[in-house]
From Swiss-Prot:
Organism (species): Geobacter metallireducens (strain ATCC 53774 / DSM 7210 / GS-15)
Keywords recorded for this protein, A-Z: Chemotaxis, Cytoplasm, Hydrolase, Phosphoprotein
Reactions performed catalytically: [protein]-L-glutamate 5-O-methyl ester + H2O = L-glutamyl-[protein] + methanol + H(+); L-glutaminyl-[protein] + H2O = L-glutamyl-[protein] + NH4(+)
Protein name: Protein-glutamate methylesterase/protein-glutamine glutaminase 5
Lineage, uppermost ranks: Bacteria, Pseudomonadati, Thermodesulfobacteriota, Desulfuromonadia, Geobacterales
Record domain CheB-type methylesterase: where: 161-357
Length: 357
């Protein structure tokens, strides 16, 4: 086998739709760093080929005959653990199945939306390639694209010191790839009587954030709901920012409230909802009494927000490399000098409770 610096990322495509198999294969094979080693028409064939060929990565449909994608995923994870990206429909039912798959070991998902319009097809293809490449970095230990300039470490922000013993009144959490499971792990370790409000921004489509919040609400002691415009950030309540738009936090009298913003107003943000915008406006709205937390995810969304909240007197926690599904977002914060504390995932919820509780 070629060394990691030379060999391609080996991908298995599992989907019962011949059209989807063709689309996924054609998108991936256009990239010289990716090789589609095989396709499978259902879960049974997918498991067989996964065990025989040992791909680096699998794209897995959810609804398939003979053996569905989640059952196939569980069998693969039991016999030959492999990184799996689920390809799911943009529906409430599709969202719930996707979260079941993430609980079963899938690292991320790609919303299937290629039939509505040219724009939708383009968006699907771009996200597919981005997520496959992002996963490839952690598998092969190198970028699957020409190396881009490393994050230039800026001057450390001027920090406003907080009085000894003063606790933060709010918590803002940002995540992307691997985030749904990571956020659940963190919130699950925070007690239901936590005295401060929490806002979570995670890169998800509009159809997914509602079901995700409902799911978290059944698994955590805290009350969890999808945020709506005008919602007040309250103690013991977690607001999940809605997908398909950006969210700002604004001062409203003595409280902090949610304001939703169309993506067209901030075209500079690649990721939706923007973690940077949530954290930046949150820090301003609460005058820096904010604990910012960045979990697993590709890219650098959240770094600018964490840098800003540090200048306002806020505190920061960042997930470590060893427990991150994708180390991009945490790495940007650590290399950028805005991480007060770096912890494994299982310790972050407890640390939030200790610092802000």
């Amino acid at each position: 086998m070629l060394p990691n610096q030379e060999r391609k990322l080996r991908v298995l495509v599992v989907d019962d739709s011949s059209f989807m198999r063709m689309v996924i294969r054609s998108v991936l094979e256009k990239d010289p760093a990716i090789e589609v080693i095989a396709v499978a028409m259902d879960g049974v064939e997918g498991v067989e080929k996964a065990l025989a060929l040992r791909p680096d990565l699998i794209t897995m449909d959810i609804e398939m005959p003979r053996l569905d994608g989640i059952s196939a995923l569980k069998e693969i994870m039991a016999k030959a653990p492999t990184r799996v990206l689920m390809v799911s429909t943009l529906t409430c039912e599709g969202a719930k199945a996707t979260f079941d798959a993430l609980d079963a070991g899938a690292i991320d998902y790609i919303p299937k939306n290629v039939t509505d319009s040219i724009d939708a097809q383009k968006a699907f293809k771009e996200e597919l390639l981005r997520k496959v490449k992002g996963s490839g970095i952690s598998i092969l230990g190198r970028p699957l694209v020409s190396p881009s300039p490393r994050l230039v470490v800026p001057p450390r922000p001027v920090i406003i010191p907080r009085p000894a013993g003063q606790r933060y009144q709010y918590v803002g959490i940002g995540a992307s790839t691997g985030g749904p499971v990571a956020v659940q792990e963190v919130l699950g370790r925070i007690p239901g009587n936590f005295p401060h409000g929490i806002v979570v921004a995670i890169h998800m489509p509009k159809a997914f954030t509602g079901p995700y919040a409902e799911r978290l609400n059944t698994k955590c002691s805290l009350q969890v709901k999808e945020a709506k415009a005008g919602d007040i950030v309250q103690p013991g309540v977690v607001l999940v920012t809605p997908g398909g738009m950006h969210t700002a936090l604004v001062r409203q009298g003595s409280t902090v409230a949610i304001r939703t913003i169309a993506t067209a107003e901030y075209p500079q943000y690649i990721y939706i909802p923007s973690v940077d915008h949530m954290l930046t406006t949150f820090a301003d709205a609460c005058n820096g009494s904010l604990l910012g937390v960045i979990l697993t995810g590709m890219g650098a969304d959240g770094f600018k927000g964490m840098k800003h909240l540090k200048t306002k007197g806020g505190g920061t926690i960042v997930q470590d490399e060893a427990t991150s599904t994708i180390y991009g977002m945490p790495r940007a914060c650590i290399e950028g000098g805005v991480a007060d504390t770096v912890l494994p995932l299982t310790q972050i919820g407890t640390e939030i409770t200790k610092i802000a509780g």
